[in-house]
Amino acid sequence: EEKIRLTIGTSKSPNNIYVYDMGSKELKKLTETLNPEINANDLVAAEVVRYPSFDGLEIPAINYKPLDASKRNKVPALVWVHGGPGGQSRTGYSSLIQYLVNHGYAILAVNNRGSSGYGKTFFKMDDLNHGDKDLKDCIWGKKWLQAQDYIDAENIGIIGGSYGGYMTMAAMTFTPDEFKVGVNIFGVTNWLRTLKS
């Protein structure tokens, strides 16, 4: 083999296909997957952050700050909860997150306890208590957002799909005063029916 085919993407760019020629050491881009109507300069880079939860456990998260957000121009925010429950939010490109950020919302994609990618102990920390400690991790993510000087601390919601949608509904049900709004994207709301299917 003289050539390697690979995909490369970032939080600001969907994956593209490249070919690397090992002889000439040339990297050639074969695709351009970003819609040409989207200005790449409008997209925001993901920033990995960590914050302490209610019990001191360090929670990893990915922060997306709108370009025009500042101390003088505070923006509303959403706590983003991934599916799973053993899924993981990563720094790769998300068209929905970029859309929300470009419409003025800061996003904190929380990797609450039970998320994959942080070892077996972290992964098993939400076993037998879904919607409890993992939800508290999301609430403490909200507290982290409130401490940022560019966030409108009174306007923070929660959003998620699949298990993240369940967490959204758990937040709205068990802690109704924590979040201003909840957006359930195809989340589980009937565990008995889900477990039977």
Question: How would you describe each model-predicted region?
Answer:
Residues 2-197:
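Serine-hydrolase catalytic core recognition
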